[in-house]
């Protein structure tokens, strides 16, 4: 008995052709669209496959928009947004949420926000339900030198019209932190801040920190304030240590100058003593010349020796016991 594979081959070919047909012509998806009231033809679904646009995404988005009462949304707009690299599902979700919340969100604005890299659906949700952002600990010093560490909670609402080109959460946090530092730094005492923490939030809110951002600040609440270090005392200690080092350096400089002056005076004294000794050495020569010339007699010489002896005796009496006496000159 011969076994023929022709029926199996034909069956396989038929299954393959049907698979290809239903891939390029999603008949079940077309039926789903018709049942939902969306006007779309099989040819349009086929052309989507040719243009490499997933018919399922476009059709499901049109069904969702139609059921939500958004009648102005067209297939060409959704296809164009998909081909531009946008997220069709998120855009339609955002349009539906905005419509239910009575938020004015045109399709062009929604697609622009999506193509700008922002989550348009999350933005609509933030417009309906404001988001609370916790700031990191902000450290500031009051005028009395006490350090304070504050934490704040910022309640923001998305500003849909500023989502394209507006600053993000990082800018909000940076501005709030700057405002907290400025408010604490302008306080005369840290006790004032601890007694009235709401003064910080009021001052920060008055500055309009949400200008140019994609958010609208609804409230700023100080969640916690801790006392840090006494920065003023540390600065005073550092200044005192610096003054001490400067004073020690100046004292050392004066001591060195005094030592140098003392050594200089000793050198001058030695020089003067040497001159005296040199002058004393000339006395015998002068006396000899005086004897030769007759200007000095023998009696004058002995009278001078007596005067020297009396002077030496008086010096010996005036000196304390044990001090060496000056020897008499011959």
Swiss-Prot record:
It holds the Pfam family FloA. It is a multi-pass membrane protein. One of its GO terms (cellular component) is plasma membrane. It is found in: Cell membrane; Membrane raft. Signal peptide: none annotated. InterPro entries: FloA (IPR022853). Keywords: Cell membrane, Membrane, Transmembrane, Transmembrane helix. The chain crosses the membrane at residues 5-25, 27-47. It comes from the Bacteria. Coiled coil: none annotated. Its main location: membrane. Disulfide bonds: none annotated. Homooligomerizes. Found in functional membrane microdomains (FMM) that may be equivalent to eukaryotic membrane rafts. FMMs are highly dynamic and increase in number as cells age. Flotillins are thought to be important factors in membrane fluidity. Belongs to the flotillin-like FloA family. This is Flotillin-like protein FloA. It comes from Parabacteroides distasonis (strain ATCC 8503 / DSM 20701 / CIP 104284 / JCM 5825 / NCTC 11152).
């Amino acid at each position: 008995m011969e076994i023929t594979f022709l029926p199996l081959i034909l069956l396989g070919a038929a299954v393959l052709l049907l698979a290809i047909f239903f891939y390029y012509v999603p008949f079940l998806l077309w039926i789903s669209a018709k049942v939902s009231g969306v006007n779309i033809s099989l040819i349009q679904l086929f052309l989507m496959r040719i243009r490499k646009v997933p018919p399922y995404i476009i059709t499901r988005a049109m069904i969702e928009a139609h059921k939500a009462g958004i009648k102005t949304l067209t297939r060409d707009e959704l296809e164009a947004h998909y081909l531009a690299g946008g997220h069709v599902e998120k855009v339609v979700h955002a349009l539906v949420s905005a419509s239910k919340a009575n938020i004015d969100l045109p399709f062009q604005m929604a697609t622009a926000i999506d193509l700008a890299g922002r989550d348009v659906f999350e933005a609509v949700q933030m417009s309906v339900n404001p988001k609370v952002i916790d700031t990191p600990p902000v450290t500031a010093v009051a005028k009395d030198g006490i350090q304070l560490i504050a934490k704040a909670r910022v309640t923001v609402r998305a500003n849909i019209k500023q989502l394209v080109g507006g600053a993000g959460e990082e800018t909000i946090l940076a501005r709030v932190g700057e405002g907290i530092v400025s408010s604490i730094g302008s306080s005369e005492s840290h006790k004032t801040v601890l007694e009235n923490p709401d003064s910080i939030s009021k001052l920060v809110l008055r500055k309009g920190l949400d200008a140019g951002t994609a958010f609208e600040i609804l409230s700023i609440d100080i969640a916690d304030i801790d006392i840090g270090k006494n920065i003023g005392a540390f600065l005073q200690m550092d200044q005192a240590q610096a003054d001490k080092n400067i004073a020690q350096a100046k004292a050392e400089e004066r001591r060195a100058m005094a030592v140098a002056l003392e050594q200089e005076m000793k050198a001058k004294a030695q020089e003067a003593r040497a001159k005296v000794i040199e002058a004393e050495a000339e006395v015998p020569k002068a006396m000899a010349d005086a004897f030769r010339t007759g200007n000095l007699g023998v009696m004058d010489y002995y009278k001078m020796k007596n005067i020297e002896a009396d002077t030496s005796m008086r010096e010996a009496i005036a000196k304390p016991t044990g001090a060496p006496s000056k020897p008499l000159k011959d």
